[in-house]
């Protein structure tokens, strides 16, 4: 006879479901608790965090919610991930969400940027994806990494490819120029799919 062990979230103690739960270094959290976390935290990063780290992160998220409510941007670059810049306060937001407050999108300080990379990840059949990677220091979030192209892998020889690369460059150049940053910026690094 099979036995089923019922597990509870180590944070809110509700019953875990098979989908959306996240594994931590010293526990597991439910989908509802995971949805409160920053969208920029990857599963790999979560596995290195403790329950105490998550509790601290949730305190940051509460403060961020108040911050995003008062966030005033003066520049916008629209795209799959849109960029919102507050030049006066040297802050920015990158988000897929239409409603930044409802999403509790992370407000990032420009001086926390350590390096930026535009990366082409090759796939099969002469196709690729274009990513922007922004590494941060002295920030609750350590990196922002996102795919620029709207659809799955794009053909190297298509207009969509050129438009996507130009969109990535525009987004990154806008960040660097708006804040007059002197950061390590790699415009083009080509990796194979296996290196990603």
Residue spans of the language-model regions?
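Intrinsically disordered, low-complexity boundary segments flanking structured domains
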Residues: 2, 80, 103-105
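Short, exposed beta-strand/loop patches in secreted or surface proteins that constitute
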Residues: 21, 81-85, 106
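Secondary-structure transition/turn motif
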Residues: 32-35, 94-100, 135-138
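Anionic N-terminal interaction surfaces
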Residues: 36-92
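Glycine-centered tight beta-turn/hairpin loop motif at sheet-sheet or coil-to-beta transitions
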Residues: 78-80, 101, 137-141
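Phosphoinositide-binding peripheral membrane targeting modules
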Residues: 88-131
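Acidic, Ser/Thr- and proline-rich intrinsically disordered linker/docking segments
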Residues: 116-196
